């Protein structure tokens, strides 16, 4: 269940905000979770677990910071949710790590509420289209651990030292459909 997550709702610390959310997964607590935010806000609005100060807008506290959310509701159902996440930044470029099955992999690390290692297509990784989801998950677990061992204390948020280490891997590839976008 490495890819599953959950959330706990709390009253906000700052009364200007609507809610505080703590995200959890098998590795522990996450500073932020985009898909978790969308799902949690959807159910919290539909089940009337929160009463936003401004209809259609929510200010949410997460360990990573305040996230601004907009949503649209019709007949008690949330139709869409969009969020403005915490500030993101590039933390490192062109790092390398040995992947037992693939050999040396080059990757970048970016922050967007969590630290993500980003693996683009390269000579020994042609893209996600050539791998099963379970294989990518397996590689991700191994590489996450290896990255944090090889680069100890390299990924610590400059404003919150409790946010540290690569917690996610993002594998990319070419679009499967040339008309795809996004």
Where are the regions a protein language model picked out?
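Active-site proximal loop and beta-alpha junction motif in alpha/beta enzyme cores
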Residues: 1-32, 39-182
């Amino acid at each position: 269940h490495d890819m599953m997550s959950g959330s706990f709702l709390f009253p906000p610390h700052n009364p200007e905000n609507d809610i505080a959310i703590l995200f959890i997964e098998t590795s522990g607590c996450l500073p932020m979770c985009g898909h978790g935010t969308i799902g949690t806000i959807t159910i919290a609005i539909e089940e009337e677990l929160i009463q936003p100060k401004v209809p259609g807008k929510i200010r949410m506290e997460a360990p990573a910071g305040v996230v601004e959310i907009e949503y649209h509701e019709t007949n008690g159902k949330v139709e869409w949710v969009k969020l403005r996440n915490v500030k993101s930044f590039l933390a490192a470029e062109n790092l390398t790590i040995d992947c037992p099955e693939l050999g040396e992999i080059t990757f970048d690390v970016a922050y967007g509420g969590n630290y993500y290692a980003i693996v683009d297509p390269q000579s020994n990784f042609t893209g996600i289209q050539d791998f099963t989801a379970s294989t990518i998950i397996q590689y991700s677990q191994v590489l996450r651990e290896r990255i944090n061992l090889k680069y100890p204390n390299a990924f610590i948020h400059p404003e919150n030292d409790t946010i540290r280490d690569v917690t996610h891997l993002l594998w990319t590839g070419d679009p499967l459909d040339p008309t795809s976008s996004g």
